[in-house]
């Protein structure tokens, strides 16, 4: 009997206030002709079975930037309280049937579908039982991949559920994923980050 393919979903956090880029929503900034959030969502769609986008700040504009993509949308009315609330909203909306879930940031423009597929493959080959945290040259990155059984434990924590707290409290359930590039530790928070990314002539996601 052929083994069932390993099935991963992504929770894409796109609700934040872009506090470090005053006056602009960084997710709507165009990179290579498309909004940053759309570029990132397409990467996860290419590598994952399903993608759940958590909306909050300027949610209507972010949703509009994603028009036409086969995504599931989740609203986080408490987005101003910070990222943990978006994580809670995202994992609460997940359907059954996944083996693992990526908690992903929408501002990582350097990531490619190949990067994400490699992380998912490492989880599958390792038996899918541990949280995988990407590192590059000693620096901790994103996305973090959670086995679905541990997502259930996070849900049970209610308002106390937070990725970093859960990881730090359960080191025995966590493994490092040594990334081959800096894509996992590169994000766009400031105009300086954007300029550095554009100067680096990053390839389009593939």
For each feature predicted by the language model, list its residue ranges.
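Acidic helix N-cap motif at the loop->helix transition within catalytic regions
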Residues: 60-66
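Conserved beta-loop-beta/alpha segment of the NTase-like Rossmann-fold superfamily
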Residues: 80-148, 152-153
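Short, structured coil segments at secondary-structure junctions
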Residues: 24, 47, 67-70, 170
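Conserved alpha/beta core of the MobA/IspD/sugar-nucleotide pyrophosphorylase nucleotidyltransferase superfamily
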Residues: 2-6, 155-206
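Conserved donor nucleotide-binding strand/loop of the catalytic core
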Residues: 70-81
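N-terminal glycine-rich phosphate-binding loop and ensuing alpha1 helix
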Residues: 3-56, 60
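Residue-level signal for inorganic ion chemistry
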Residues: 12, 25, 37, 90, ...
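Hydrophobic residues at beta-strand termini and immediately following loops
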Residues: 31, 74-76, 134, 177-179, ...
């Amino acid at each position: 009997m052929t083994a069932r393919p390993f099935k991963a979903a992504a929770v894409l956090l796109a609700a934040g206030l872009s506090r470090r880029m005053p006056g602009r929503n960084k997710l709507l900034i165009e990179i290579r002709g498309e909004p940053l959030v759309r570029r990132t969502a397409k990467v996860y769609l290419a590598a994952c079975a399903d993608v759940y986008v958590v909306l909050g700040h300027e949610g209507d504009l972010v949703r509009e930037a994603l028009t036409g993509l086969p995504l599931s949308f989740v609203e986080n009315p408490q987005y101003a309280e910070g990222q943990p609330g978006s994580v809670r909203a995202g994992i609460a909306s997940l359907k059954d049937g996944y083996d693992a879930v990526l908690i992903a940031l929408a501002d990582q423009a350097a990531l490619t579908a190949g990067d994400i597929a490699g992380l998912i493959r490492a989880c599958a080959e390792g038996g899918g039982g541990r949280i995988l945290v990407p590192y590059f040259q000693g620096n901790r990155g994103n996305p973090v991949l959670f086995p679905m059984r541990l997502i259930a434990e996070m849900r049970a924590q209610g308002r106390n559920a937070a990725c970093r707290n859960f990881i730090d409290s359960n080191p025995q359930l966590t493994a490092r994923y040594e990334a081959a590039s800096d894509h996992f530790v590169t994000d766009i928070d400031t105009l300086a980050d954007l300029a550095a990314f554009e100067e680096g002539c990053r390839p389009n996601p593939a």
